[in-house]
Design a protein with these regions (language model features):
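Short, internal acidic amphipathic alpha-helical interface segments
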Residues: 81-120, 124
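A generic structural signal for beta-strand entry/edge sites
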Residues: 55-57, 77-79, 120-122
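Short amphipathic alpha-helical segments
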Residues: 26-33, 89, 93-97, 136-143, ...
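Well-ordered alpha/beta subsegment
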Residues: 109-142, 146-161
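The feature represents the first ordered module of a protein
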Residues: 60-95
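Short, exposed beta-strand/loop patches in secreted or surface proteins that constitute
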Residues: 49-51, 71-73, 112-115
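Charge-rich, low-complexity N-terminal segments
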Residues: 1-66
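A generic alpha-helix structural signal
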Residues: 38, 98-102, 141
């Protein structure tokens, strides 16, 4: 009688999580990279993380803003999204606010942009995980956090209710 003995390497691969498989294939562990970037930027031990069925969500304080980082998964079609709220709506002189935000989007926001989400003006950047490098992760988080921190107080002073 012959018994089937599965190849040990195949069995080991089958027990790896999708994050581990991605790291093995690309050499990048996105969760670890994000946590490293956040730990270097977060103030006063403010970083928090939660893991749900839709991925990982981090929150940390940077200057005067809270920054959120969401990683939906580890496949090429999953996304890394970073955002920070800078102003609640409605605002004073909204036409002038919209003009200012559009002008800043064109000249000052690099890969990020100002947007309106749930009646809040946010600085946001989002991209797929496909070919995402540790440097891009760091740059994206840094750009969003810095632009939000540099502009929130000015926008609130000028346009806040």
């Amino acid at each position: 009688m012959t018994t089937y003995q599965p190849d040990a390497e195949t069995v080991a691969t089958q027990t790896l999580s999708s994050d581990e498989l991605l790291q093995e294939a690309t050499g990048v562990n996105y969760v670890e990279v994000i946590q490293t970037v956040i730990s270097s930027m977060a103030q006063e031990d403010s970083a928090m993380v939660s893991q749900t069925e839709v991925g990982h969500l981090w929150k940390f304080k940077y200057g005067s803003v809270e920054v959120f980082v969401q990683l939906t998964g580890s496949t090429d079609d999953d996304t890394l999204t970073v955002w920070s709220s800078v102003l609640g709506l409605p605002a004073k002189d909204e036409p002038q606010l919209m003009r200012k935000l559009l002008e800043m989007n064109g000249a000052e926001t690099f890969e990020a942009r100002f947007a309106i989400v749930n009646d809040r003006v946010v600085v946001i950047s989002s991209r797929t995980v496909a070919e995402l490098s540790p440097g891009e992760i760091s740059r994206t988080i840094t750009i969003v956090a810095t632009i939000a921190d540099n502009n929130d107080e000015l926008l609130q002073q000028q346009f806040g209710q």
